[in-house]
Swiss-Prot record:
It comes from the Eukaryota. Residues 53-62 have a biased composition (Basic and acidic residues). Belongs to the prefoldin subunit beta family. It holds the Pfam family DUF4686. Residues 625-654 have a biased composition (Polar residues). Keywords: Coiled coil. Residues 97-244, 276-559 form a coiled coil. Signal peptide: none annotated. This is Coiled-coil domain-containing protein 30. Residues 38-65, 614-654 are annotated as: Disordered.
């Protein structure tokens, strides 16, 4: 019954609207005829009216044409809306809504069950992957700890080797320059090994840092997966809520259709109101036209008064005012000329207006023809609509029968629906229990993950501290290596100085040999003194051998002097004099007293220089003192040789 009432309202409203539109068109045609009659009757020769008339005419035409267009558009829109509403009603009648709701609910429940099963599988997989990842992380941490311990042991072994090498280097200062070079090569090789080990340690540290970053990324991925699982659960809950909302939305659609029908009725009322407003506008136009007629009458009265005034002025004119009148006549003539020009222009405008009026009349006739055609079409459409209404009434009767059957089915479906709602409630309770259990497990899993994360972060902090300590140790080792390099450079410089001193000594030896050759030449000249010179040479050779043997003793004495500088200075001088006396007895020696004194003085001077060097550089290393000892030994030998040569030169002179 409700559907029949709706159909009647929907079909009665277009009939009323078409009848109203036809009545409005007729009234508009009558108004246009009246306008044409007034336009033809009011073509008077007045400038003011001719200026105002085209404006009023344009306004009348625009106002008369605008409502026609609006009515046509409104009729078309209403017809389209009615067709759309009828199609929606037919579709709703063809397919019952409760069956749709049941189907959608069944599909939604099946989809929700499938999604829940998928989520459970994903959770199991994530748990298994999490346990395996934790085991791998623990194994990796153990490996890293072992590698760090191995690195520490390597560093300790390198430190011990370095200390041993330093001690060896200190003890090997007494050896020759060849041994120094060999040790330097070994040290360089060891340094290279240390550098290689440091580089390998740095690479291992970088690799450990990369592994730690990978572990952090893996933890972040696990967190993201947990978040995704939460989102999927929320989506499943939202889908269930959407399925519950579908039922309410379908009922809302039926109400919306009813509101649309009411809106269509309101639009019909609005159109009637618009027609009333148009009638009021037409009345205003008639009033304005009456006002224009009154203005024309006033203009005619004014012209009559002007003519009467001219006649009175001609009868009462005096001779004194002739000149003024002549001037006024001239002005009037000029004004008349202007008025004639204006009249000509107005005549041209009238011709144009007549042409426009003729065109408008032709347009009005064409519109009337179109209206007659539209009336015929509307009559045909009304007959077609009546036929459709009869068909629809028959269909409605069939729909009523089908609705009765559907009502019976609906009762059965409602019972089934109640059973489904009960099952749905049970399912929701089970789902709530599952969700609670899942949340509890998820919280436990979160707590475990947080504990693991805390452990990992603590271990990472400890590793970073260890890495920093190792880096500091490597920096210290590098500083030590640089210090050793500087120390090696100093040693090399000292070795170069010693080589230069050796070269100087060799030059001195060659000079002495040249002197010996010159002495041999003198000996060959003085054959008489050859025997004496041979003996002296033999004695000199013996003395040189003794001196070379006792150079070692002198070096030992100099070392003991360095250890006991302050206590045994006088004792060493006396011992040196006694040793020299023993080596070079005064009775058998060919040395003079002055040469001996010079050699003693040279020894004292060298000792004084040594004392001054030790006071100036108290913190110099031991190899420098050893080099100074060797230098002093060389100087003593050269001084003795010089004294011997001077004595040898003095003897032949004597």
């Amino acid at each position: 019954m409700c559907q029949e009432g709706l159909f009647r309202l929907a079909l009665s409203s277009p009939r009323k609207q078409t009848a109203c539109s036809l009545g409005e068109r007729r009234t508009l045609a009558e108004a246009l005829g009246l306008v044409d009659s007034t336009l033809e009757s009011r073509r008077d020769p007045n400038s003011s009216l001719q200026k105002e008339f085209p404006q009023h005419q344009d306004e009348d035409q625009s106002r008369a044409a605008a409502p026609q267009d609006c009515l046509l558009r409104d009729v078309e829109c209403i017809a389209q809306k009615l067709e759309a509403s009828l199609e929606e009603i037919h579709r709703g009648a063809r397919e019952p809504r409760e069956e749709r709701e049941q189907r959608t609910l069944g599909d939604a429940l099946e989809n929700a069950r499938l999604e829940i099963e998928k989520l459970k599988d994903n959770l199991m997989k994530l748990k298994e992957s999490g346990t395996t990842d934790l085991q791998r992380a623990r194994e990796h941490n153990q490996r890293l700890d072992e590698e760090i311990l191995a690195l520490r042991n390597r560093v300790r072994s390198l430190d011990s080797e370095k200390k041993v090498l330093g001690e060896m280097y200190l003890t090997s200062g007494e050896k020759t320059s060849c041994q120094h070079q060999g040790e330097l090569r070994e040290l360089r090789q060891n340094l290279r090994r240390l550098q290689i080990l440091c580089n390998s340690a740095e690479k291992e540290l970088r690799y450990e840092r990369g592994r730690s970053l990978d572990l952090k990324q893996h933890n972040s991925l696990l967190q993201e997966e947990n978040i995704k699982i939460k989102i999927e659960l929320k989506q499943a809950q939202e889908k269930l809520l959407d399925n519950a909302r579908l039922h309410s939305s379908l009922t809302a659609e039926w109400k919306h259709c009813q509101q649309k029908v009411k809106e269509l009725e309101l639009e019909g009322l609005r159109q009637t109101q618009s027609l009333k407003s148009q009638q009021g506008l037409q009345e205003k136009l008639a009033r304005e036209k009456s006002k224009a007629a009154e203005a024309q009458e006033k203009i005619l009265d004014l012209q009559q008064k002007l003519d009467h005034g001219r006649q009175v002025c001609l009868s009462d004119v005096c001779i004194l005012r002739k000149k003024q009148l002549e001037e006024e006549i001239k002005e009037a003539k000029s004004i008349e000329a202007r008025l004639q020009q204006q009249c000509q222009e107005e005549q041209q405008r009238r011709i144009l207006l007549d042409q426009d009026i003729n065109e408008l009349q032709t347009q009005v006739r064409a519109l009337q023809d179109k209206e007659e055609q539209q009336e015929a079409v509307n009559s045909q459409q009304q007959e077609a609509l009546r036929k459709q209404l009869e068909r629809e009434r028959r269909k409605c009767e069939e729909y009523v029968k089908s609705n009765q059957e559907l009502s019976e089915k609906l009762s059965n479906l409602q019972q089934e629906k109640e059973a489904l709602w009960q099952e749905h409630g049970r399912f929701l309770e089970q789902l709530g229990d599952h969700v609670r259990n899942y949340k509890d497990k998820h919280h436990c899993h979160k707590a475990k993950l947080q504990k693991v994360k805390d452990r990992l972060t603590h271990e990472l902090e400890i590793r970073n501290k260890r890495i920093k300590e190792l880096e500091d140790e490597t920096g210290k080792l590098q500083q030590k290596i640089e210090m050793e390099k500087v120390f090696q450079g100093q040693i090399m410089a000292q070795n170069d100085i010693l080589l230069l001193e050796k070269r100087k000594l060799l030059e001195q030896v060659t000079d002495q040999e040249e002197l010996i050759c010159s002495s041999k030449c003198t000996i060959s000249a003085f054959q008489s003194k050859a025997s004496l010179l041979d003996k002296e040479n033999q004695q000199l050779q013996e003395n040189c051998l003794r001196l070379m043997q006792q150079i070692g003793l002198l070096e030992q004495i100099i070392r003991s002097i360095q250890i006991r500088r302050e206590e045994e200075t006088v004792i060493t001088d006396n011992a040196a004099f006694e040793i020299l006396k023993k080596i070079l007895p005064l009775q058998n020696s060919s040395f003079s007293g002055t040469g001996f004194v010079l050699s003693a003085e040279n020894l004292q001077e060298t000792e004084l220089h040594k004392w001054e060097g030790a006071a100036a550089i108290p913190k110099s290393p031991e190899p420098l003192s050893r080099s100074q000892d060797s230098e002093s030994g060389y100087i003593n030998v050269t001084s003795l040789k010089e004294t011997h040569n001077t004595q040898g030169d003095q003897k032949p002179e004597l």
